[in-house]
Swiss-Prot record:
Domain of life, per lineage: Bacteria
Organism: Pseudothermotoga lettingae (strain ATCC BAA-301 / DSM 14385 / NBRC 107922 / TMO) (Thermotoga lettingae)
UniProt-annotated binding residues for ATP: 9-16
Protein name as it appears in the record: Nucleotide-binding protein Tlet_0523
GO molecular function, one term: GTP binding
InterPro entries: P-loop_NTPase, RapZ-like, RapZ-like_N, RapZ_C
Keywords: ATP-binding, GTP-binding, Nucleotide-binding
Amino acid sequence: MKRILVVSGLSGAGKSTVARVLEDIGFFCIDNLPPALLNDFMVLLSSSSIDKVALVVDIRSAQLGNAVQAIKKLVDNYSNIVTVLFLEASDEELLKRFATTRRRHPLEGQLSLQEAISKEKELLRDMKEMSVVIDTTGLDIHTLREKIGSLLKEEAQFVIRIRSFGFKYGLPADTDFIIDTRFLPNPYYDRKLAQLNGTDQEIVNFFSKYPVVEDFIQYTYKLLHIAATRYKSEGRPFMTVSIGCTGGRHRSVYVAEKLSKILKDRFYVYVEHRDVNK
């Protein structure tokens, strides 16, 4: 079966670097493919002997809206073989990279560099929702290679994508399950814990005091295990589970991390925290 990776994301986040990594591990890479040609390329690929392809889609200001729609259509039409990788990095990291390379951001124009970065994030929000997100902040080439290798490990293997999010920032657009954790005890109201997130030990200690949290995690695990087993038997390549709390910082992150650790005993699991830094 063919495997198509669409590499997209924020300017300066490392798309070209990721393309080189993918090329090194056996992918045929096409850089800067115009989104309008995606469908034509898939038609050509259907009669080709090439099995693993990475398409780096370079999205410029005049094409943003059409590009997002073109990639969404591609995913809808070829969901069994297409995965979108969305590369991002912190604002501080992006500012540093642009300063180092002395390249202009494609949206800069009349905007400052910081404004251009913020504008691009907003324009690509829908793209990010349908993608597997890779944060390249602070990653050297060797660590990035390991991260991508881990992501692509056992390519034919069924994957569970677990995403934490905050309801206040909107529902995820592309998901199979939405799990609401807003009824659980909230560490936000403890001033010492408010600025931490669900991966911090202090938050772990907080939730360990409430049996209802562990009960909820165990019941949710049983539900997801049943669903994942069925999805896998039906030939589905992945299952996406979105776990939400009010702001996406404490409860949803903690539950997502706990569930991923349990599910990893039986499935390949990929975790991302959409709103943890907002």
